[in-house]
């Protein structure tokens, strides 16, 4: 296929046009008074969003050179979203500003490679300064404030996230689901819950709720099917002597074994309940090991030389309470040693860090949370489906932002942290004048998020930026109320991780784009395909079909 090639200024201009189209669509959403963007969908109602990365992902331009520029800046937003879960609009505004300033310098004859080296040097200094500015987000108040800011100043969402983190711990799993009412609600599942219920409804001992509830039961964990009752009779007799109920978690319980357990249960003999083990394949084995660690038991597995016929009470786990429903099982307060549980959680955390699959990461994090103390579910309420989608996106953003805040602490929000980090660049010098120009490019770009927040709130950006620069520390501008003051006291916080990743990703992609000299893309089909269509000679234009 024939290619279209553009060089030098022409290539950079078209790339910059694409960057501006995407960045101008995204930047209107920044800050407490940022506007919404309406996105048409090929099916269903249009989406209304104030989420930078959602807007960026929808933009595809007709001109292929412009589109390349737009896609490269979209990469900035996506990468920031992946790392920090928020700050996508800030990253886009930074990238656009670095490119605009940088393109002027390249046009003036400066060396693009030296400009990039200067920008990279400035980023390293600014990131160090951001770390120095950050304070730990230890208390619920700071977490709620970060969540509120990220959810577009929705304090209810911030409070719900703070409550959820308080209940399940900062490493616990918090999921966001669509609710069935107009209100946002929080549900917390204490203990370990997995999505398998009783094998037979005859195991239920609470007829009103159709659940099986046991206090201080023994828990038998088996990684194979149980179909022959004779395999487990010796163990059942030992459990009977202790007058305790028994929960069996196995790959399956069937035929004679299931029938005998059900009959025993109904006659009021041994109180039992059989549940299929959660997961499939290797994940099932791992989850059985998790339950064993939590309850202080051992998985009866032929792979390690254990059999049901010789199983003893010491190999069974125990828990304070177990509730088994039609579709779920909840184990509360397992008897496992806290040190063993911590080691298991740490082992899973290492697997999360090493995993490259998002799906595997999600499943590993769920396992980690179930061991660490439970799962919280935030149910988002709204009047219409369109509002529900928009709100769910905001809650997801807020959740990611609070996690980032817990990880690396918080800095003053509203673009102030980047303005303060500029102080680290005042004495910084490169190896030559072009590198110094690169440092100045980043210095000017670091004002851009604050300028955009002020512009979106309808004020004069230059006046506000000069006022903020004349102050120090947490002194900044609250765009929601139009007041100056201490940003931390006003509850305007950003996670340090968000500010850092936005700056690093914007400078990384923008620096590479500055050093572009040639752009190559496929020619549109019509440009090289039409010539062949006339070669038919009397075949009515069918020559191109041969």
UniProtKB/Swiss-Prot annotation:
| Principal place of residence | cytoplasm
Q: Subcellular location, in the record's words?
A: Cytoplasm
Which GO biological process annotations does it have?
Answer: protein refolding
The keyword RNA-binding belongs to this UniProt entry's keyword annotation: no
Q: Name one Pfam family in it.
A: Cpn60_TCP1
What's one GO-annotated cellular component?
Answer: cytoplasm
Residues that, per the record, bind ATP: 29-32, 50, 86-90, 414, 478-480, 494
**Which UniProt keywords are given for this protein, alphabetically ordered?**
ATP-binding, Chaperone, Cytoplasm, Isomerase, Nucleotide-binding
InterPro entries annotated for this entry? Chaperonin_Cpn60_CS, Cpn60/GroEL, Cpn60/GroEL/TCP-1, GroEL-like_apical_dom_sf, GROEL-like_equatorial_sf, TCP-1-like_intermed_sf
Q: What is its EC number?
A: 5.6.1.7
What reaction does this enzyme carry out catalytically?
ATP + H2O + a folded polypeptide = ADP + phosphate + an unfolded polypeptide
Which is an annotated GO molecular function term of this record? ATP-dependent protein folding chaperone
The record's function comment reads: Together with its co-chaperonin GroES, plays an essential role in assisting protein folding. The GroEL-GroES system forms a nano-cage that allows encapsulation of the non-native substrate proteins and provides a physical environment optimized to promote and accelerate protein folding.
| Quaternary organization | Forms a cylinder of 14 subunits composed of two heptameric rings stacked back-to-back. Interacts with the co-chaperonin GroES.
Q: Per its UniProt record, what HAMAP family does this chain match? A: CH60
Which family, according to UniProt?
Belongs to the chaperonin (HSP60) family.
Q: What name appears for this protein in its UniProt entry?
A: Chaperonin GroEL
Q: Which organism is it from?
A: Psychrobacter arcticus (strain DSM 17307 / VKM B-2377 / 273-4)
What is the organism lineage in this UniProt record?
A: Bacteria, Pseudomonadati, Pseudomonadota, Gammaproteobacteria, Moraxellales
């Amino acid at each position: 296929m024939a290619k279209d090639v553009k060089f030098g200024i022409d290539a950079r201009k078209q790339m910059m046009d694409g960057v501006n189209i995407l960045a101008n669509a995204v930047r209107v959403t920044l800050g407490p008074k940022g506007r919404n963007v309406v996105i048409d969908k090929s099916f269903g109602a249009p989406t209304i969003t104030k989420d930078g990365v959602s807007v960026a992902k929808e933009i595809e331009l007709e001109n292929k050179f412009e589109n390349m520029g737009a896609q490269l800046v979209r990469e900035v937003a996506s990468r920031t979203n992946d790392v920090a879960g928020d700050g996508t609009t800030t990253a886009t505004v930074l990238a656009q500003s670095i490119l605009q300033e940088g393109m002027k310098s390249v046009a003036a004859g400066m060396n693009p490679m030296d400009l990039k080296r200067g920008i990279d040097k400035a980023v390293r200094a600014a990131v160090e300064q951001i770390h120095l500015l950050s304070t730990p987000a230890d208390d619920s108040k700071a977490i709620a404030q970060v969540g509120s800011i990220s959810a577009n100043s929705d304090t209810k969402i911030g409070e719900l996230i703070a409550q959820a983190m308080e209940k399940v711990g900062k490493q616990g799993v918090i999921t966001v689901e669509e609710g069935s009412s107009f209100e946002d609600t929080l549900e917390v599942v204490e203990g370990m819950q997995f999505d398998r219920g009783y094998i037979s409804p005859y195991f239920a001992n609470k007829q009103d709720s159709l659940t099986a509830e046991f206090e201080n039961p023994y828990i038998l964990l088996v990684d194979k099917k149980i179909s022959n009752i004779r395999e487990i009779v010796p163990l059942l007799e030992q459990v009977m002597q202790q007058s305790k109920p028994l929960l069996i978690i196995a790959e399956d319980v069937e035929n004679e074994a299931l029938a005998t357990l059900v009959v025993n249960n109904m006659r009021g003999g041994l109180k039992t309940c059989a549940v299929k083990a959660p997961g499939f394949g290797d994940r099932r084995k791992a989850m059985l090991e998790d339950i064993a660690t939590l309850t202080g038991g051992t998985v009866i597995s032929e792979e390690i030389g254990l059999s049901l016929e010789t199983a003893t009470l010491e190999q069974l786990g125990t828990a304070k309470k177990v509730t088994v429903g039609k579709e779920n099982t909840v184990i509360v307060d397992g008897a496992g040693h806290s040190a063993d549980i911590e080691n298991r959680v740490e082992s899973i955390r290492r697997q999360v860090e090493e995993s490259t699959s998002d799906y595997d990461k999600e499943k590993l994090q769920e396992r980690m949370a179930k061991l660490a103390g439970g799962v919280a579910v935030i149910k988002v309420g709204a009047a219409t489906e369109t509002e529900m989608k928009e709100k769910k996106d905001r809650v997801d953003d807020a959740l990611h932002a609070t996690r980032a805040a817990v990880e690396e602490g918080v800095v003053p929000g509203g673009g102030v942290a980047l303005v303060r980090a500029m102080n680290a660049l005042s004495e910084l010098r490169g190896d030559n004048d072009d590198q110094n120009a690169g440092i100045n490019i980043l210095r000017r770009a670091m004002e851009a998020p604050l300028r955009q927040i002020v512009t979106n709130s309808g004020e004069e950006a230059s006046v506000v930026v000069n006022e903020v620069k004349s102050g120090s520390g947490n002194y900044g501008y609250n765009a929601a109320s139009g007041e100056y003051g201490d940003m931390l006291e006003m509850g305007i916080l950003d996670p340090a991780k968000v500010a850092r990743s936005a700056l690093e990703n914007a400078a990384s992609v923008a620096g590479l784009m500055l050093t572009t000299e040639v752009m190559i893309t496929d020619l549109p089909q019509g440009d090289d395909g039409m010539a062949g269509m006339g070669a038919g000679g009397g075949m009515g234009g069918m020559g191109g079909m041969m």
